[in-house]
């Protein structure tokens, strides 16, 4: 049996990005998830439902570092595989003076500037523009998975009830290191059970429209979770994601028709060309492809990205572990937690993967482990 250095729990964008990072470092890894990258219609994980665009809302240096690193990697991806990642113009519009606060990333993105009055259409009075990146998220997930499989990294479907099981899965054998990228699963996974993890429901509308630019509504008076945005997807299909909403602690995956209608109305106001009639139609003329719901994996304190040393085995957890988790009398192991990123999963993914890679390096050095090349 192949000997693995680590098992990654979670096959969303974080789990797959981390697996790629560790593979590039020469580690033998495997990915295990309830849902696989091909399950693009599953509401069991958030990754397939994202827009996604790079629009950082980092509030501290660690978050800024992750987002900026990912931005730089997206630049490379956009040149190499443009149908996955594309650089395009962004426009953020608002009505009242002072609504926009100058962002930290104004010198990271391309061509940041305030719009002239004649460049802003009614009912808006102010705006800002710059260029950044958007992803075709379903294709990007499949790309990450394909890259891993080409490197002979297994991506397996398994439903684990406890963290301890991951250290001795029948298909993979015994490992001493697990990466916990379980997203919302971190709330219920035995051995983690983080009560501060919760969902933030997002609802979007996938449409087909002749729009190539991203748009966002800046409205300090908007209802919580109700801020319109428009994200064209790279590729030849002409697909555009319209959003959005952000409803904390809402576990429902049902589409709310009233929310969908409000999204279409607000987005048509942001960019009338969505109607396919040069802006001369109404929101009802927008060509709707599908209505979508995803549950963002949020954590009250933000991302948890840290190493935890654990002891597993019959002497420690005989009352909790499943049979697969009982692997001897008190074996010392490690786990790197990487969950709770909320709505910033894609725009921080590669920066988080880099950080996890550094934590793994430190853990292996401390534990006198060598990669199983």
Curated annotation (Swiss-Prot):
Signal sequence extent: 1-19
Motif Microbody targeting signal, chain ranges: 371-373
EC number of the protein: 1.4.3.3
Binding site for anthranilate 2: 57, 246
Positions contributing to FAD binding: 11, 14, 35, 46-47, 51, 53, 296, 342, 345-347
InterPro entries xrefs: DAO, FAD-dep_OxRdtase
Disulfide bonds: 214-271
Protein's recorded name: D-amino-acid oxidase 3
Species of provenance: Cryptococcus neoformans var. grubii serotype A (strain H99 / ATCC 208821 / CBS 10515 / FGSC 9487)
Gene this protein is translated from: DAO3
